[in-house]
Regions:
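Mobile, glycine-rich extracellular loop/lid and propeptide segments
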Residues: 2-5, 70, 87-90, 95-98
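Acidic, metal/cofactor-coordinating or nucleic-acid-engaging core segments within structured domains
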Residues: 41-47, 51-56, 108-110, 120-337
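Conserved catalytic cores of phosphodiester-cleaving nucleases, focusing on short active-site segments
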Residues: 92, 114-120
Length: 339
């Protein structure tokens, strides 16, 4: 079931995100993501904010919160049926699990996920009014930015590849089939490439401003509001009915990790989890010993220029070997234990 959180939680999350960046903005999306998910970053702060919202333990009942961060070493890629060139699935993902258990049963009340595409606003107009796809405002046809937007805004059928060097897809013909558009499955998150000045400051109520995956939509949802809407399965605060929910539920059982099935949104979520290091997954759900992910102080990025053959593919493999483009996966689990 969704968490029951007050609207003020969003402001508390945004306040802590500002503290992570020490109220200084500017830098590439990968560098800014590294700051967000550093050892003293969002993970610990989110746990401190959410833990007090759990129901106090009573005789025969308790609630526990576990938050983990996993880094997928090389980002998975999608190859749309309508496009011969692969595209990275996203820069980050958030998962939420709600587990009920007692002496006789273990039942997953809810499993939910959202994929996030991070972009650094560089153009003057984007610094003042960031809008999807952020950088650039109008991408070249067949560019990586154009392909990212096509994937997250349409979710046409695609083949999923484990990494850029993978010759064969992990899953063929994945069909997410969102019921409405813009889809709830994937959102954009924007951060300023350079420090906002003057009137530009008003656009950045949070270091990360978010929007659904639809061309031209303003990034006017703070990351705190996005996380709140995701965890509560509700509309974004002040977003109105025009915005979709953040994320979509999926069917989950730990046995699916060893025996995946299907080719829909459920399968895509399971495949992302399968790529996560086992010891980074919530121990309460997966039984693995959870560890702390260490983020490199400097993450370098080169644009995706690959194709299905020749120099582009070789370049991708070389780039990923030297500067692996990792995908951050934030996992939030609530366990409700009776008895």
């Amino acid at each position: 079931m969704p968490l029951r959180l007050e609207p003020e939680i969003a402001a508390a999350i945004d306040s802590q995100i500002w503290e992570i960046y020490r109220h200084r903005l500017g830098g590439s999306e990968l560098r800014q993501l590294a700051k967000l998910f550093k050892r003293s970053g969002l993970l610990t702060r989110l746990e401190n904010i959410l833990s007090p919202t759990l129901r106090p333990p009573s005789r025969g009942y308790r609630e526990d919160l576990e938050i983990r961060l996993a880094w997928i070493d090389k980002r998975p890629l999608a190859k749309l049926e309508t496009n011969p060139r692969r595209v990275e699935l996203g820069d980050a993902a958030i998962f939420f699990f709600d587990l009920f258990q007692n002496a006789k049963t273990k039942r997953y009340l809810q499993s939910r996920a959202v994929i996030l595409q991070a972009k650094a606003a560089k153009e003057k107009k984007q610094l003042a009014r960031p809008a999807v796809p952020v950088n650039p405002t109008i991408p070249r046809a067949m560019s990586s930015t154009a392909r990212e937007l096509e994937l997250l805004s349409t979710w046409r059928k695609f083949d999923l590849y484990k990494a850029s060097g993978s010759r064969a897809p992990t899953v063929r013909g994945i069909s997410v089939a969102p019921p409405r558009f813009p889809p709830a499955n994937g959102w954009y998150m924007a951060t300023p490439k350079s420090r906002p000045r003057g009137a530009e400051i008003h656009a950045w109520k949070s270091p990360w401003m978010c929007a659904p995956a639809a061309s031209g939509l303003l990034c006017n949802v703070t990351l705190g509001n996005l996380i709140l809407a995701f965890l509560t399965s509700s509309m974004v605060n002040g977003g109105g009915s025009s915005l979709p929910e953040v994320g979509t539920n999926f069917k989950f059982d730990p046995q699916y990790l060893s025996m995946p099935r299907g080719n829909d949104w459920d399968r895509l979520c399971i495949e992302i989890l399968r790529l996560c290091p086992r010891n980074r997954l919530p121990q309460s759900l997966f039984g693995a010993r959870a560890g702390v992910a260490v983020v490199a102080s400097v993450l370098r990025s080169l644009p995706y220029i690959g194709s299905e053959d020749g120099l582009g593919d070789w370049f991708l493999r070389f780039r990923d070997f030297i500067w692996p483009r990792r995908m951050a996966v934030l996992l939030i689990a609530v366990t409700r234990t009776e008895g």
